Amino acid sequence: MTSLVIHAEVTCHLLHELVYLLIGPHKREDQKLIYISRVSLDTFPKSALPQLMERASPERRDRARRYVRIDDCLRCLIADELRAYSLKLDYKVPVQSEVSKNAFGKPLLANRDGPKFNLSHDGKWIVCATSPHPVGVDVEAVAEPGLAVVSNDFSVEEVEALRTTATAPLSIARAMIWTRKEAYLKYLGLGLTVQLDSFSVIDQTLLSPAEGMTDGIQFYSWCDADNSHVISVCGHGEEVVISCVSGQELLDGLPPS
């Protein structure tokens, strides 16, 4: 597993514009850090499905069985494996720790005083964010050029920003804003009670904030190496530590204590 650090002061639009620092072992449970673990669906063979089903909790197993497509079923199961992996690695949370939900359906550890986590998956990436504080993460596969749609869920300010963007293709710029909006909603944990067009997130800046705790939050967004996916995270942290986990690491078991 390799790890990278993004510093808040150098966060930019695209992956090749970001300044990354390759690091070795770093201090976990740091109050100033947000941890991101991601794993590619491409690293899991379809034959791994029975093993993942066997290891899943009854609730997660039932949820996975509702999917028709194998890839969707795999994403559902891998996400829960990645959650357990990340919480144990980052905060030494026991693998069997109970997961509950708040009144709006946001998953939380049953121990509400423990670390917070959030999951997202789309396309080939499954992503987990962990933090001592509320956190939200979203990943989206970038639409094909010419297919990026700016819907009514974007604010007036965001539509104008996309109309005049000159720093990135429209499909990437749209995905940047959309994933920030989704990450912010997941950070708040208020479900669909907040309208998407009631706030704007442009260049890591929250405008017209929706109801909720917003002091000191940071937004981080980046593309993967081939610009096919965008990931955004919202939370309280001066740095984001990104780890890429292989499918084999999850299949081989959770990290040691």
Residues of each region from the PLM?
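Core catalytic alpha/beta fold that binds nucleotide/phospho-ligands
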Residues: 2-257
